[in-house]
Every structure is written in structure tokens, then in C-alpha cells.
Curated annotation (Swiss-Prot):
UniProt keyword terms in alphabetical order: DNA damage, DNA repair, DNA replication, Ligase, Magnesium, Manganese, Metal-binding, NAD, Zinc
EC number, as in UniProt: 6.5.1.2
Disulfide bonds: none
Keyword Transmembrane helix in record: no
GO molecular function: DNA binding; DNA ligase (NAD+) activity; metal ion binding
Family classification: Belongs to the NAD-dependent DNA ligase family. LigA subfamily.
Domain BRCT as annotated: residue spans: 577-658
Protein name: DNA ligase
Role, per record: DNA ligase that catalyzes the formation of phosphodiester linkages between 5'-phosphoryl and 3'-hydroxyl groups in double-stranded DNA using NAD as a coenzyme and as the energy source for the reaction. It is essential for DNA replication and repair of damaged DNA.
Amino acid sequence: MIKSQKEYLERIAYLNTLSHHYYNLDESIVSDAVYDELYQELKAYEEKNPNDIQANSPTQKVGATATNSFNKNPHLMRMWSLDDVFNQSELQAWLQRILKTYPSASFVCSPKLDGVSLNLLYQHGKLVSATTRGNGLEGELVTNNAKHIANIPHFIAYDGEIEIRGEVIISKEDFDALNKERLNANEPLFANPRNAASGSLRQLDSEITKKRKLQFIPWGVGKHSLNFLSFKECLDFIVSLGFSAIQYLNLNKNHQEIEENYHTLIREREGFFALLDGMVIVVNELNIQKELGYTQKSPKFACAYKFPALEKHTKIVGVINQVGRSGAITPVALLEPVEIAGAMINRATLHNYSEIEKKNIMLNDKVVVIRSGDVIPKIIKPLETYRDGSQQKIMRPKVCPICSHELLCEEIFTYCQNLNCPARLKESLIHFASKDALNIQGLGDKVIEQLFEEKLIVNALDLYALKLEDLMRLDKFKIKKAQNLLDAIQKSKNPPLWRLINALGIEHIGKGASKTLAKYGLNVLEKSEAEFLEMEGFGVEMVRSLVNFYASNQEFIRSLFELLNPKNSDMAEEKQESSSVFNNKTIVLTGTLSKPRQEYAQMLENLGAKITSSVSAKTDFLIVGENAGSKLALAKKHGVSVLNEEELLKRLKKLDQN
């Protein structure tokens, strides 16, 4: 349960990271069930606190951002995501919202295939483009690869412009054969059929896609000029053009029929040719669909009725610890192999040591393992009645399994704070160069990856020893680009002290805390625990993190400070802040703006403003976008100055000119 706006913003960041890995990297970090639970908690918080909703929330957007591997291509009509329902009562509530106004509505029910959504554009009967869903507005152009999918027609008997949409999948049988080939060739195995389908569709070599035996199963249309009366009629038309028909498609009239259809699919799930993770329910009558419309993310006339997670019993035979990029330690259980949904499972996440203790999970326990959404397994609970005396307590590690440094143990999470830990180095450097840290132009994720691969850097100190010939070894680097990056790295020397503190990436210490620390001078990190606790806004966890971080990285920090020679203050920034109309003002942003609220918040904070989430008599300015809601009324009640986006931009521009 999310209890504060801080937890809400952290949840958004975490879910967006999970989505990036799932959609863009073909990598599932958590199970579908865990993601769904976290997502539903986010959604519940937003329903109770609509004024806090952020534009970058996963509830406000669809799918993924297109990567750089393929050209971006816009859809003629947006591709939407579906809202999920998880049980009979949620389905009943969803149906009632529709049937209350449209009692004659019927529903098309079909299997929800776990694959990659694809949009096919036909003009004058010819396939002209194939684009992945991406963020719903644009995706990756994969036309050449799509043409190698056997059941995608290159020509259809329809002369108008039409977008035909569906799911790219690989059958269970072909998935098993593909993984056997990869095993024999000493290549890494695909985790599941969805990852295999996604990776195969996004190959730079179309010949590889051709060998993967992908299939395209249509589920709808985008832009077209046909006059269908029903969704079922639309699907029948697609099949008449030469596309594959959807198996187990039914037209249902009420809740009882839908439930019967759903449970039939669950029974048939194991023998189905491809992996399923639910049933799609769509209002059949297109006039009702039109009247129901859409939310910001999804159609109101359709939903996905998710399948219950799959469980099996097995035994924990060992535990290993993995180190994440942030330094977080994740315990992973080694299991006696067990087959779930056609996959042999021998590992499952234990999430964190707090959860192990809470669930009383022990080594040699027989446990319930769940593989929801046919993806990553996790341990639900131990079966304590099977304990035979061989069980042992799973102990929290005291040192990092990678670098052997002492770990920071908090109530829930355990962290490696050693900046030189190989598992942390890359992410630490990405943060070091970021906009809110040293802001090194041109030093992004991909460049840092290459620098590591070429063994040119190990930590931040190595950046300042790079030479022109070093950078010329990197992909797509010529003399001008290499020199520009070297200049940017050198320019980052003599930074404001707060920027260098923030660049260190200390757990719980963000931009605001870094600015507070900078007020205490260049030796601030050497202060004692008692001295830190006296600082305004510094709690026990922040202080413990600071003290432990400095203890683990003293030599590195001293060398970095000596090399970069940070300034006690940034006169340019201070001058801009003090001359700003927003300096020391409390500001609230609300409504839909042309840029993410966080971007405006960052600009205003740089001008000395304090950004809060709620309007009160102490608020100085309310910045309003479209659909400002109750905060605007409250601002007027308290006599708060209200600026629209255009007025804000004018003031910001004027400050820039000064």
C-alpha cells in the first residue's frame, strides 16, 4: 500500500524501470503477478489522490518507448493498452458499468496471447509497413522482419488503407526447438516464448527472424474506412483477407457465459499451442464502443481478465545473493527443478531479507513456487508441515558477494555501498554524469558501456585520464565527437560542491540533501553521525547511509575531491536564484502541461523555488495546465497567484535573458 507522495513517486520510477526492461530489453525482472500487484497499488493511490497523478506514471501511458535499434514510425491511429481485471468481483464491476447504460451489449471473448503487439499497414492491398506497439503513438519499424512471418500476407484483397493489428508469438513447440538449438550452439537460452518472439522480431538480420517460425494472430484494426457494425464482423473480415483465425473466440451475453468461457480457457491452457495469460473481453457493438470511449491509457469497452498464477511445490536447496546496479542485494533461492507451464524452474527470487524473515522461509524448506504470467517465478510461502529438522535459517550477508565490502543493512533492503564494486560501477558512472550531478554532455549510457567494454575506465577518476586516442576506439567516434567529450569532461571540473556530493550516488541523499550538506563546507562528509543528525531534515537512515558510505569510500572520495576541486558555492546559480521572482517561493503544479511536471519542477527548483504537492495559504504560485481540477479552486480561495503555462514560460524566458 502506498502511503505518501514520496512512495508514490518511487513506485512510478520502479514500475517504469520494470517496463523498460520488459518491453525494450526483452527482460522480465519481476513476475507478472508482482508487477500487477504494484501497478494496482499505484492505481489505487491515484484514484484517491487524483491531483498527485504524474504524466510519467505507467497508468498514463502505453507500453514502451521506441529504442534506437530501429527507426521510429507513428501509428495512424493510437494503439491502446488494456485494463486488467483479476477476479469475479472485479469483472462483475466492469460489466455493470457497461450493462447499466447498455443492457443489450454483448461481448467478444478470446484468448490473451502473451507475445508482441504489431501494427500492419496496408495501402492499395499491399503491406507497406509493420510497426511494434511502442508507446502507443509510435513504435519500431520492423517491416522487413515481419515479411518473413509466414502467415502475414504481403497482399490482401482490399484496396483501401487499413491498419491490421495482432500479436506476434512463437508456439510452445517451436520455442522448445529453438532453445534446444541454442543450447547445442552454446548460446544463451530464451527465458520464455514472449522474450523469444520479441527478440526474433527485432533482429537486425532478417534471415534470423525467418528461421524463428514466428506467427501473427490478428485481434483488431486501427485506421480504416469500412462500415462494420460489430467487432465480431471486423474480426471475420480480417480472416477473410487471409489472416489466421483466433481459436476459442466466443460471443457472450452476460457474466455467467463469460465466466464459463474463461474457465474453459483455463482448463485448455496447458494444451494450447501458445502461452496464454488471460482472456480478452471486448464490447461487440461498435456504436457502444464509440460512446464508451477511452481513458488516457485504455479503452473503456475492453479489458483483460487475467489468469490465476500457476503454482508448484519444490524444495530450497541453496541461496545465492545477486548485486543490482544500485548496490541492492537480492537473495535468490536455488530449487530442486520443477516444471511450471512447460518451463523447468530451478531458481526463484526471494526479493529481500525482510521478506524472508517475514515469511519465515528457511533453507531446505518445501515451498510454494508461483510462475504468474508464465514468466519469472517467486516463492510464496514455506510449507511448514513438511519440516523435518534439516531446515536452517537463511542469514543476511554481512559482506558483498562480489567485492567483499561490508554491507549496509536497513530494515528492508541490504546494500553494497562500495562505488568500485563491479556490479555497481556502470550505474554509478551513469548517475555521476547525469544532468543533476556533474552534467557531462555526451557521456550517456551507451558511451559508458563502451568505455567499460574497452577497459578504459573502472571508476569516475578514470574519466579524467581519458585521451583522444582512447575515445577514437569507440564505435561512431570521430575526432570532433571525441574532442567534444574530452572538453565536456574537463569542463565538469570545479563543480559546485552540492553537484559533486549528489554525483556520488549516496543512498537516500538526493539533490536537496546534497545542497544542504554543501552549506557545511568541503569537509562535510567527514562529519560524525551526531553532527549529521543535527542537520535539518536528516533522519537516521540518511545519516547511517552517509556515515557508512564515507567509511567505505574514503580514499576514493578524497582523490575525487582533490582532482575536481569543487567550489563551496556556485555564484552563477546563486545569482540566478536570488534575482528570480521564484526564489524562496512555494509552488504547486497541477493539470496537464506540454512538458512533464517534473521538468518544470526542476527548472523552478534551480531558481530557488520549493515545489510541493498541495495548495495551502502558504502557497505562493499555482502553475496550471489543462484540467486543473480542485487545486485551482483552492488556490483562488486562498488568494494564491495563478500562472498558466504560457505565463510561466514567459517569466522563465525573461529570467534567461537576464
